[in-house]
Regions:
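Flexible, glycine/threonine-enriched loop-and-boundary segments that flank and lead into catalytic domains
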Residues: 161-177
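Short, conserved catalytic/metal-binding motifs centered on acidic residues
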Residues: 6-12, 42-52, 186, 193, ...
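Flexible loop/turn segments at secondary-structure boundaries
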Residues: 167-170, 194-196, 204-206, 235-239, ...
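Extended hydrophobic-aromatic, low-complexity segments
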Residues: 195-198, 207-210, 220-228, 239-241, ...
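Electropositive, glycine- and tryptophan-enriched low-complexity nucleic-acid-binding patches
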Residues: 174-221
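A short, flexible helix-boundary coil/loop motif
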Residues: 288, 312-342
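Helix-centered, glycine/charged polyanion-binding patches within enzymatic domains
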Residues: 224-296, 300, 322
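Active-site- or DNA-interface-adjacent structural scaffold in DNA-acting proteins
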Residues: 1-165
């Protein structure tokens, strides 16, 4: 018996680094085996979601202020003498941004933003000359230079200093116009709902391009290739992905029989079942905010959330079977105690 936390947080960090993405896939494979052969369904449903990173909403002024504050600390480590530390200047310039949407404060906010960018550029230029190429801080300096040089219309922009791989996605949500993180593709069984694959995309690709690596992961983890993948309209553009048939909503064939139409409707109704599964991954299994670093952290966090979801589903199924067995046992006991009249 020990009073205290089960382990230190750094131990989990070392564990994740040791197992990597391949080890996380093995953990997911073990949770799929809990469900037996019922998990290996011929038809699966596929959908994509956004795994948001633990970063603030990026703006030019926020990034410039972070560059100034981080650059001042880095200058102290490398013995670079700056003319000033900007400890009072940066908060004043950030305070000027509060009224940027008002008529009186718009010009003041633009002037403060230009001043912040000028200060950040000055600090980065001094660090660029002082920090050696082999230093660990060199990557930070290069990232800061890219942030200060990027424009509004540029592609592959950097939105975070500590997470430069983050990209912006707009899924058309009314309450959340832009999301910053990594796109995730999730595959689940059509009837059982067991998550068979969870693939994190390194770039913001079209949904159909994410299907092939996701199905390859299903083949590695679950040990089979699904015959049919049912997706939404985001997967349009291809009828087959390797040996797997891709089915998406559409007008259908003109000469389709009533049976084919009914089968298609049932398929697309079942496709919608993956939406609450993804919602539970976010609300119950920590997929709504990813605190792990880098693209490897994106992949591991997604796989661990899927691996935690499958045993939860299995335990609910076992509980339902137990309740069903107890009800049958109770009915038999009552019928034996009070037999029905002949």
């Amino acid at each position: 018996m020990q009073c205290g936390v089960p382990c230190d947080a750094s131990e989990l960090t070392h564990f994740r680094k040791r197992i990597g993405t391949a080890g996380a896939e093995k953990i997911l494979a073990a949770t799929i085996k809990l469900h037996g052969e019922r998990a290996k369904e011929k038809e699966v449903v596929v959908d994509t979601t956004v795994q948001e990173k633990n970063i603030t909403f990026p703006t030019d002024t926020k990034l410039a202020a972070k560059i100034v504050r981080g650059g001042v600390k880095m200058a102290g480590r490398h013995g670079v003498k700056l003319r000033q530390s900007f400890e009072r200047t940066v908060p004043k310039l950030l305070a000027a941004q509060r009224g940027r949407r008002t008529k009186a404060g718009a010009a003041r906010a633009r002037k403060a933003a230009r001043r912040l960018k000028t200060i950040a550029g000055r600090v980065v230029r001094q660090l660029d000359a002082a920090v050696p190429m082999e230093s660990r801080d060199r990557r930070w300096v290069e990232t800061a230079k890219k942030i200060l040089s990027q424009k509004r219309s540029d592609s592959r922009k950097i939105y975070s200093l500590h997470e430069p791989e983050v990209y912006c996605m707009s899924k058309g949500k009314e309450h959340k116009k832009y999301e910053f993180g990594a796109k995730a593709s999730v595959v689940a069984g059509k009837n059982g709902g067991v998550i068979l694959g969870a693939y994190s995309l390194p770039e913001n690709d079209y949904d159909g391009h994410a299907l092939e690596p996701t199905l390859e992961q299903v083949e590695r983890v679950a040990g089979y290739r699904p015959a049919v993948a049912i997706g939404d309209k985001g997967f349009r553009g291809q009828s087959h992905c390797g040996q797997t048939e891709v089915v998406t909503p559409g007008r259908g064939k003109k000469n389709a029989s009533a049976y084919e139409k009914r089968k298609a409707r049932k398929r697309f109704r079942r496709r919608a079942a993956i939406e609450p599964r993804i919602g539970h991954l976010k609300s119950d299994f920590r997929l709504d905010r990813n605190f792990l670093k880098g693209q490897v952290g994106d992949a591991i966090n997604l796989l661990m959330a899927a691996a935690a979801s499958n045993p939860s589903l299995w335990m609910r199924q076992v509980l339902l079977r137990l309740v069903w067995a107890l009800r049958i046992f109770q009915q038999k006991c009552q019928s034996a105690q009070y037999p029905l009249p002949a």
